[in-house]
Amino acid sequence: MVVRQAERIDQLEAEVAELKRQLGQNSRNSSKPPSSDSPFVKPAPKSLRRRSGRKPGGQPGHPGSTLALVADPDERLRHEPGACDGCGAGLAQAPEVGVERRQVFDLPPISVRVVEHQLVARRCRCGATTCGMAPEGVVAPVQYGPRITAIILYLYVGQFLSKKRTAAALAELFGTPVSEGTVAAVTKRAAAGLDEFLDVAAERIAESGVAGFDETGLRVAGELHWVHCARTDRYTLITCHRGRGQDGMDHAGVLTRFRGVAVHDAWAPYDTYTDADHQLCCAHALRELQAVTDTADPDADWCWAAQAADALVAMHKLITDAIATGATAPDAAIQRALDQQIVFYHSAVQIGVNQTAARTTKIMQKHNALAHRLLDRQDDYLRFTRDWRIPADNNGSERDIRMIKLRQKVSGCLRTLTGARQFCAIRSYLSTATKHGKHFFEVLVMLTEGRPWLPATN
């Protein structure tokens, strides 16, 4: 009886510990997004960032971004004083002794301008009738011009408004009634004009030495689909597929021919691409290590996960500080410091493997799997210490793909897979253009004019 009670107590304690672990998960110690955090629970201050020593707010020397007076305003209005504030005398003939300038930045009334193209037909003496040619792009009796269609794309794809709200915005801002069907048709035509751009983006990413990869869920036609992102600092390719794994990655067409260093999280299908080297995301590892620390004995003086996390942070700081000074490779002093932190990392995760080897509870099994991964794939986690072109984390990919979640929050799911792929194609175009210093509206006008922007070949 006593033995059975002890076994039952151990089982219940393990269940309680697992439930506490699940309740303790948040965006700081797992892969859960910040939107899943409870709005009613103020999180404890457990930021993975270390103190910088600087005060909050703008730093000394920061240029600021306030409005400034312009030298040549569009209009000048003079406001003369009527009478003297001192004696009440008229000031019409008084000398001018100064002018205070105040400028108001505003928009003029906006209205749509309609241009009619008249195609004149003339009959020659020979009897043949010849008609004038319409300008390129003028193909219907009535149609919207490139700037209006660019605004539709800007609101719908660039700012994530729904079709209904996009149509309402056009009607209210510009007095132009637009149907939801028009928004869909404009998006379809725009995406169809991006085939060459998408081929170029995929090729440039596949040829790069370092590229980031990530994926996130998107509701399409009421079902979960997956958006895949391949990116560099200059190019972005976003695709949508029903599968999260290798089928979806193959559909994007980058990893199948990629020979550089792929930066990604520990999602197993990435490891099937053996022609590439791999840099596993240290930011993900830090969140997992934080989860181990959160469930550790609060009375313990030392935790293997905390030491491993501190070593990763220290290595990253050593490299970023050196790069900030213009260095491209470690000198002897930096290499010694890196080697020391690598020893700290290795010994910590080795102890983690040993401490959790019993795997008697679900928590211990999870922590053991993490420690084994950090140890077995140490080279892939620390590749950034050997080649400073490689980022330690996959934050760039997460930033490029984050807009999918933002779009879903603002306007909900997409109705069809075709529509989702059109959205992803245009977002690839906009993200890449931004990385080249171009503005959304500028490149959208080029796209709707039938001459989509392409990145320079050099």
Over which residues does each language-model region extend?
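Catalytic center-proximal scaffold of phosphoryl-transfer enzymes
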Residues: V3, H117-R123, A128-N458
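Short, flexible loop/hinge motifs at secondary-structure junctions
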Residues: M1-Q143, F213, R219, M364
